């Protein structure tokens, strides 16, 4: 059994210094992007998925349920990006959401086994009414953008913490 370290004023001070030092390593901003702009920047390569990200693993049903959540206007978790020296943004968390949105809007993904919007089973983006397509593309997503000075180790650590 490990001996517990006694909490002393010196340890409290050292802990505070460590906390402040590590907090300074992560600077970020939040931005809201419309779905249309997110997809445009992703298609152009302005937003990209790094090598350390796991491969696209959502099953068709998970992708459909995510699209259904967007159509229903449900809150969608933040995506996390990080700035790069070349001006692009690396997708730290949100790659599967981004790929699913692109697959639905650009590549004719068909919805299936929806939980609530059962009348949309078998629909692709193009099958939706013009008004619904416009609303879908104008839906905003909140993105946390880490400063470009954020190291690869910190980015990977954040990815691992979010996805555990």
Residue map of PLM features:
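A short, surface-exposed helix-loop junction/capping segment
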Residues: 43-51
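Alpha-helix boundary recognition
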Residues: 42-43, 71
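Basic- and aromatic-enriched surface patches that contact anionic nucleotides/nucleic acids
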Residues: 2-37, 50-164
């Amino acid at each position: 059994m490990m001996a517990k370290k006694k909490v002393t004023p010196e340890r409290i001070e050292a802990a505070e210094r460590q906390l402040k030092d590590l907090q300074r390593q992560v600077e970020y901003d939040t931005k809201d992007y419309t779905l249309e702009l997110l997809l445009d920047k992703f298609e152009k390569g302005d937003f990209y998925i790094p090598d350390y990200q796991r491969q696209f693993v959502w099953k068709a049903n998970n992708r459909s349920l995510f699209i259904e959540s967007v159509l229903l206007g449900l809150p969608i978790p933040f995506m996390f990006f990080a700035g790069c020296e070349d001006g692009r943004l690396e997708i730290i968390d949100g790659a599967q959401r981004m790929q699913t949105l692109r697959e639905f809007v650009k590549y004719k993904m068909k919805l299936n086994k929806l939980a609530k919007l059962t009348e949309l089973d078998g629909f692709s983006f193009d099958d939706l009414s013009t008004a619904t397509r416009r609303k879908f593309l104008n839906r905003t997503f909140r993105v946390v953008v880490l400063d470009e000075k954020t190291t690869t180790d910190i980015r990977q650590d954040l990815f691992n913490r979010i996805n555990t």
